[in-house]
Amino acid sequence: IRDLFRSSAQVFGDKVQYFYRDDALVREFTYNDFWSTMREFGTALFDRGLSNAHVAVVGDTHPYWVTTFTSVISTGGVIVPLDHELDIDEMINFMRRAECTAVVYTGSMNGRLTSRMNDLPFIKYFIPISPAGEDFSGGRVMSYEDFLTEGRAKLETGDTRFEDHEISMDEMCAILFTSGTTGSSKGVMLSHRNLTAAADAACRA
């Protein structure tokens, strides 16, 4: 997955990969933006001891939701995407079951997770994508942009851990919780091979 995005940036560069809405503004996110964000966030994960970690991501549509997904699995970690419409107690239960140690979330989740810090002692980092109005007083909150700044600084010193990390195609890289319509929700474990096969099939369809 990491190599696919690196080669896409080399081929498509400053072409727009995503248009997304930021309040009333429509912004562009290029292939180079995506790869740079992946490298910066992934390097910060290494620096913070979060490579190989299980990281939840929850919220509305945003390019950083996707870069979180791809960065985490590129460091040897496991991504745990959660529906932002879930009941907060169910969300906490899923993060506990998936053994998450960090959670990345968009502005719609501000306050909902940090207000339940006492129920999330296993979460070392709460990482808001849009930090405006978020409560940073708990000591475990660090904004997404601060992660990117930290990763960028490490890259400027020659840190290559993110791109050098070797990935086994058969390693688990994602846990997807089922809807639980016929019983309790189950965590489906997917490998890098599963994801790349799905991407390849989608391209061929």
Predicted regions and their residues:
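Conserved S/T- and glycine-rich ATP-binding loop of Class I adenylate-forming
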Residues: 55, 72, 103, 172, ...
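Hydrophobic alpha-helical segments in the ANL/AMP-binding
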Residues: 6, 46, 63-82, 91-92, ...
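Solvent-exposed alpha-helix faces
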Residues: 39-43, 96, 108, 183, ...
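Conserved AMP-binding A3 loop
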Residues: 28-32, 165-166, 173-200
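Structural core segment of the AMP-binding/adenylate-forming
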Residues: 74-150
